[in-house]
Amino acid sequence: MSLICSISNEVPEHPCVSPVSNHVYERRLIEKYIAENGTDPINNQPLSEEQLIDIKVAHPIRPKPPSATSIPAILKALQDEWDAVMLHSFTLRQQLQTTRQELSHALYQHDAACRVIARLTKEVTAAREALATLKPQAGLIVPQAVPSSQPSVVGAGEPMDLGELVGMTPEIIQKLQDKATVLTTERKKRGKTVPEELVKPEELSKYRQVASHVGLHSASIPGILALDLCPSDTNKILTGGADKNVVVFDKSSEQILATLKGHTKKVTSVVFHPSQELVFSASPDATIRIWSVPNASCVQVVRAHESAVTGLSLHATGDYLLSSSDDQYWAFSDIQTGRVLTKVTDETSGCSLTCAQFHPDGLIFGTGTMDSQIKIWDLKERTNVANFPGHSGPITSIAFSENGYYLATAADDSSVKLWDLRKLKNFKTLQLDNNFEVKSLIFDQSGTYLALGGTDVQIYICKQWTEILHFTEHSGLTTGVAFGHHAKFIASTGMDRSLKFYSL
């Protein structure tokens, strides 16, 4: 039978057992340990020498103990030193085991702390977004206190009650009529002449991609869904993204001027104000936001709808917004006060609106519906004055030409239809490739060119209605396209998160 000492891991000369832990020890080692600690080395229970129980085993014949000479004395000293080393080694093993357990516990605590920090960070971010949403309500502007001639919004307005409509007052109607008269007169003066600075078709046909920017919106939620250029300075680009942000970008300096945060869902429509440093955005979160670009802050939240806002257009006066929604209503709102002036639906249709666009004169506008209809409305009378059937599938985009005569429309039927507003009929249909998607339509400022964006970007020359340019640079669906001043460049955005520019 072989016994092993629990301290030295060697066969003991004088084995004994501890009744506390039932472990076997070399008597001299355990006695030294008890003398120092008074406990059992295995379970740290109190233990005395009297409690130790000797174990009787058959020992091999051993030589007589050394006599008191110098060599035996050295051996005895070495034996004592070895005993001390064994005791120290055993203590270190115990401490190592304890340290490992403490380290494991600390690692679990660290992991739990990281999870808590991540959750709290997410909650703080959500709280900040909620605060940004509530801030526009802080400084309520009483509508009567804001003169109609005031050039810009200087405070934050109250999100209005959906049931509280101000109405189209005679003063507002007269203002709209006066502006339309001025614009019509200017258009007649211009006649059919094309600006000399406008890029010629043969030059436009040579356009190629000259720049691409992918850092405007989040990479984790890719996609730019809306695009607009500032009418007074087309170097200023406005985009709305799937990341819920609105971004103002300067083409000339290639710098982001402002990142506007506040929407709780993706941004699907954006509009630049032509003369004030304001931009507008709409989202499926059922809100329209008015932003100050210099302050990078929201100055008004217009709550005109109960469902997703699908279209946004600024009136020629620069004082009113037109919006369309999944709630089947179009709304006409005052940007000075953030209040809804009127809100109308076509009760005979009962269908969601997909887009909305003002005519250049501002007295009529068009809306697209989910059931393939294009409806023309009289703003002063709030009545549906004409319908343009012919598409199949939801209407995806509509665009009025600056000449005031043409309307371009697109739907999920791989076609673009051109309508003559004087004769109220379809005079041309651009039939595209099968499964070609059209998400954006726009005429240039002179009404000479028509651009469409979707599966790719195509440019047509009006009157002949022939394609003169075709871009396939976007790796995803093209969601927006726009012309620079006098068509000196073309801009496009897409689901590949890029803003691209094309020119000579």
From Swiss-Prot:
Task: List the cysteine pairs that form cystine.
Answer: none
Residues modified as N6-acetyllysine: K122, K179, K244, K261
Catalytic activity reported: S-ubiquitinyl-[E2 ubiquitin-conjugating enzyme]-L-cysteine + [acceptor protein]-L-lysine = [E2 ubiquitin-conjugating enzyme]-L-cysteine + N(6)-ubiquitinyl-[acceptor protein]-L-lysine
The answer to keyword DNA-binding applying to this record is no
For region May mediate interaction with PSMC5, the annotated ranges are 68-223
Please give the Gene Ontology molecular function terms for this protein: identical protein binding; ubiquitin protein ligase activity; ubiquitin-protein transferase activity; ubiquitin-ubiquitin ligase activity
Q: What does this protein do?
A: Ubiquitin-protein ligase which is a core component of several complexes mainly involved pre-mRNA splicing and DNA repair. Required for pre-mRNA splicing as component of the spliceosome. Core component of the PRP19C/Prp19 complex/NTC/Nineteen complex which is part of the spliceosome and participates in its assembly, its remodeling and is required for its activity. During assembly of the spliceosome, mediates 'Lys-63'-linked polyubiquitination of the U4 spliceosomal protein PRPF3.
PANTHER family (UniProt xref) = PRE-MRNA-PROCESSING FACTOR 19
Q: How does it assemble?
A: Homotetramer. Component of activated, catalytic and post-catalytic spliceosomes. Component of the Prp19 complex/PRP19C/Nineteen complex/NTC and related complexes described as PRP19-CDC5L splicing complex and PSO4 complex. A homotetramer of PRPF19, CDC5L, PLRG1 and BCAS2 constitute the core of those complexes. The interaction with CDC5L, PLRG1 and BCAS2 is direct within this core complex. At least three less stably associated proteins CTNNBL1, CWC15 and HSPA8 are found in the Prp19 complex.
The protein's name is: Pre-mRNA-processing factor 19
Q: Which gene encodes it?
A: PRPF19
